[in-house]
Amino acid sequence: MLGEVKENNKGTKMKIIAQRSNGDIDVEFLDNYHYVFKHAKYQNFKNGSIKNPFDKTVFEKGYLGDGKFSGWANGEHTEEYEIWKGIIKRCYCEKQRDVFNSYYNISEVCDEWLNFQNFAQWYNDHKYECDGRLHIDKDIKYPGNKLYSPYHCLLVPQRINMLFSNKPNKRGLPNGIVKYKEGYLAKYAGKDLGKYPTLEEAYSIYSNAKKDVIITIANEYKNQIPEEVYTALLNYEVRIENDKNYIVA
């Protein structure tokens, strides 16, 4: 028994490094992390069911890591776990690549955040009370950014996050712009903003309208959101090149 080596169900080699009575053992995983699972059952070692927190079990990219944060509380996933799993799913879940076509194979999660412990620590350091749920945003500080990381991301209220939703369309035009024979119609928040002879003119009107709304809502939330979030909202520039639907002719 002592010194016995076997693979767990995820294919990671593990070795028995201590044994006690009644099949009570300690197991070391033989990967780069060398995590030691203490007081495992020998039967679980034999059937490969001992879990290594460094196995990439979340869409073959993310792993729980070793630390104080659990993905579960009171029989359900924690808020930080759901958000963490969600960003990995957007970027790497092949089965839902059509659902997340503006993220899959385009955006990435930084190596640091593939470890849930690191993301959970960041989340708990930055969360705050506000009206509505908190969402993670990677574009407000750095428009067009494609990396989820502690440097690039902010936690923002859901209402603010929805302002930056970039819904996919098949027109090859940025959101808020409709092509007409005479030119282009600008629309925002259900309102027609007029027709213009060029795309650039129409988008300028659209971007000004959107910027006004962003500033208005930022001021509504000023006393709820961190200064970093408020400043990022005021500094945000609505640019045509950051619209994922826009195809340069």
Each language-model region and where it sits:
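Secondary-structure transition/turn motif
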Residues: E28-Y33, Q158, K187-K191
